[in-house]
């Protein structure tokens, strides 16, 4: 799904022979010769974009976005280094306590980080039942999905899950982030990549802040470390259920469109329709199942996945999905049409024409072919969401530049369906009044987009 090419690779793809420097003495001459061909390579690439109907998205989205991302990288995000250091110490102590509790439950000391040793402890020593678990060459896997299934069998499982989450946050963030903080401004300056993922979504590195948990208490504690300059606030603008709105629009599913237009809780409305009951009689379990189906279908989830996500039996999960397609028949038709079109064209495309080529749609291997079919269904939805987000970032950045100087308001992060702005407190109201409309106006869909807004003095408050 991801690829990075060097100038030499790109030149060779369009018929130019560029040579790497053989040694340091020839490096300057090699760079000079290669750079001399940049304009010709550029023209060839533009011709390819035009021939494939991609020139518009390049000129309207990807090219202007480079300026936005460069500014975001320079802006960075402020870090409370004292809080982070305190958190690291607290978590190291907590991790040591968890380690001892796990040893007590196991009746022995062992390397908790070793899947093989953990496998022996759980299934050989503690005799946990492995039926229904995914397997590795050496036996039942101890991955996160299997641990969730084992939770009811032994109290050690919950401790291991907590240990793993805490260990990851400690090592990936609390202990590693201080090494990446710029000493001059006390800020983290991540790298943003706009052309790495196959769907067009942005990715980030050094650090990647997209994987910090949002709902767990320890994840929220870590987010408290991300703060603002004095006199400023963070403002979050988050697209609400953007992929479901795109799916309803692409499928022209009138039932779902009507629920969105009416401002209904879409998961509640889905559960009510599937179970044929009034909205006020929907249980939490029924809403959870509806939510799992609504989002799961975007990624090709079937009855087995729904059963795992909700605790339903396989039969009940299958019935739920079958009834879902009765309630929303155009969703099923859209999924079939998306696969058929991608197979006919050789690629899936977003609303604005971004392509993902899918040669595996014709694979004789069923598993590989099914994976490509899921991509054909998902790319027009997730890829369109990515295009919309990029267009919104450009629109918001332009508006901020027209109305404020860099010290008063600036884009600092884009994560999933959300952008973060750091702004002087006295400018917050003006920004909140303008930005949601900028974000919703970038595209005209059958279902209007919606943006939620939150403010705070650190990331955990959003």
Question: Language-model segments: which ranges?
Answer:
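Flexible loop/turn segments at secondary-structure boundaries
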Residues: 119-120, 199, 210-212, 242-245, ...
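Metal-dependent catalytic core segments for phosphate chemistry
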Residues: 236, 243-275, 355-369
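A short acidic-Thr-Gly-centered motif at the start of a beta-strand
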Residues: 218-233, 401-405
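C-terminal polymerase-core module
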Residues: 93-100, 104-157, 326-374, 378, ...
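Glycine- and acidic
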Residues: 27, 49-53, 77-85, 226-234, ...
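Conserved catalytic core of nucleic-acid polymerases
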Residues: 74, 182, 189-190, 195-197, ...
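Gly/His-enriched, cation/cofactor- and phosphate-binding structural elements
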Residues: 230, 242, 406-410, 414-442
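Conserved "right-hand" nucleotidyltransferase catalytic core of DNA-directed polymerases
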Residues: 2, 6-18, 23-214, 233, ...
């Amino acid at each position: 799904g991801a690829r990075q090419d060097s100038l030499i690779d790109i030149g060779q793809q369009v018929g130019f022979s560029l040579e790497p420097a053989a040694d340091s003495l020839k490096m300057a001459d090699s760079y000079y010769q290669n750079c001399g061909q940049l304009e010709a390579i550029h023209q060839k690439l533009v011709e390819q974009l035009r021939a494939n109907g991609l020139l518009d998205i390049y000129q309207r989205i990807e090219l202007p976005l480079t300026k936005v991302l460069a500014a975001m990288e320079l802006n960075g995000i402020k870090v409370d280094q004292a809080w982070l250091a305190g958190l690291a110490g607290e978590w190291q102590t907590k991790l040591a306590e968890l380690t001892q509790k796990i040893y007590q439950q196991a009746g022995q000391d062992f390397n908790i980080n070793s899947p093989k040793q953990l496998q022996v402890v759980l299934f050989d020593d503690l005799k946990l039942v492995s039926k229904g678990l995914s397997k590795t060459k050496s036996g039942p896997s101890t991955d996160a999905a299997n641990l969730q299934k084992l939770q009811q069998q032994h109290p050690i499982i919950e401790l291991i899950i907590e240990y793993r989450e805490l260990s990851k946050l400690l090592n990936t963030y609390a202990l590693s982030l201080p090494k990446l903080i710029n000493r001059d401004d006390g800020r983290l300056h991540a790298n943003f990549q706009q052309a790495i993922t196959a769907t067009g979504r942005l990715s980030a590195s050094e650090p990647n802040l997209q994987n910090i948990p949002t709902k767990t208490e320890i994840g929220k504690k870590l987010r408290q470390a991300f703060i603002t300059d004095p006199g400023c606030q963070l403002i979050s603008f988050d697209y609400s259920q953007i992929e479901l709105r795109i799916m309803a629009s692409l499928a022209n599913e009138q039932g779902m469109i009507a629920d969105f237009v009416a401002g209904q809780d879409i998961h509640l409305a889905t559960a009510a329709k599937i179970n044929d009951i009034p909205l006020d009689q929907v249980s939490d379990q029924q809403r959870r199942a509806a939510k799992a189906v609504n989002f799961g279908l975007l990624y090709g989830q079937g009855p087995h996945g729904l059963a795992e996500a909700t605790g339903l039996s396989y039969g009940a999960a299958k019935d739920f999905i079958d009834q879902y397609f009765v309630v929303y028949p155009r969703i099923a038709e859209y999924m079939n049409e998306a696969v058929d079109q991608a197979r006919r064209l050789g690629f899936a495309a977003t609303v604005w024409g971004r392509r993902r080529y899918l040669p595996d749609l014709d694979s004789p291997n069923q598993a590989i072919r099914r994976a490509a079919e899921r991509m054909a269904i998902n790319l027009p939805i997730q890829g369109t969401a990515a295009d919309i987000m990029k267009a919104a970032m450009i629109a918001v950045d332009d508006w901020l530049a027209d109305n404020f100087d860099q010290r008063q308001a600036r884009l600092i992060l884009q994560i999933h369906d959300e952008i973060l702005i750091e702004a002087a407190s006295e400018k917050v109201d003006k920004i909140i009044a303008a930005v949601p409309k900028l974000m919703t106006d970038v595209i005209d869909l059958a279902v209007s987009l919606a943006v939620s807004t939150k403010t705070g003095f650190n990331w955990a408050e959003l």
